[in-house]
Amino acid sequence: MMISQAFSRVLLVASTLMATTAVATASPPSVKSKTIDYKIGDQSFEGLYVYPYTGKGKVPGVLMVHNWMGVSDETKKQAERMAKLGLAVFAVDVYGKGIRAKGPQDAMPLAGKYKGDRKLFRERVLRGLEVLREQKEVDPAKIVAAGYCFGGTGVIELARAGADVQAVVSFHGGLDSPTPADGKSIKAKVIALQGADDPYVKAADIAAFQNEMRTSNVDWQMTVYGGAVHSFTDVGAGSDAKTGAAYNQKADERSFEAFTDLIGELFPKR
């Protein structure tokens, strides 16, 4: 009897380990991508849709807001990364079809237009949310937003607009707000993932953002990565932190892990 019981326990442990290993080593789903044309008034836009091919019905969606270059190869790379988690990702086109920056000299005025007109910025991002919810693979009740740099500002503005999403995640985004009282409209969880040495996000902006979140009773979290500057998720930013914008592998991996953990918390049975 004792041998039988011991053997049963060994089998149970072995089975548990095998199951755990199977989950840990499960292959990510294959992903597909396509562009989606849509309009706001008479203006045309072209977003990027990247989604998992799972055959399991509807999946949670991610509204992605691009960096100041516009929808680009970097946007696609990050969208594919998220889609491999079993999420359908729509990268909204803030600028308009065919309007893409070729370099910082183009990006600065493009991004500046929307940083200076938050109402227009919100309208562009909110329209993208509508397009995402229209996709047949997407569960419209399970949506988060994620943005990078300029796009990080965009997803926080989406939250300030009172959008009905579960969470917004800003990767090295701008935190300032010309209308901090709009924090009272936030329904979503707000996650800000920042580089400790980002020269483009001032200490005063961080303090004001935190005060906005506190006084508005938002469910929020800020994580600061030591040694990281602006654009820490973008390999194309180079490795020279002295420029103020550079890739940082540790911050990139840890921030994506933070995003992954949030998805697991919000959608445990996706």
Feature roles, as predicted:
Residues 192-194:
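Short beta-strand/loop motif that positions the catalytic acidic residue
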Residues 78, 202-212, 221:
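Short alpha-helix in the alpha/beta-hydrolase fold that links the catalytic acid
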Residues 1-12:
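Bacterial N-terminal signal peptides that target proteins for export
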Residues 214-270:
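C-terminal catalytic histidine-bearing segment of alpha/beta-hydrolase fold enzymes
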Residues 197-201:
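Acidic catalytic loop of the alpha/beta-hydrolase fold
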Residues 35-137, 233-246:
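Serine-hydrolase catalytic machinery in alpha/beta-hydrolase-like enzymes
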Residues 185-190, 216-219:
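Short, proline-enriched alpha-helix->beta-strand connector loops that line the catalytic pocket
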Residues 125-186:
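Primarily recognizes the serine-hydrolase "nucleophile elbow" in alpha/beta-hydrolase
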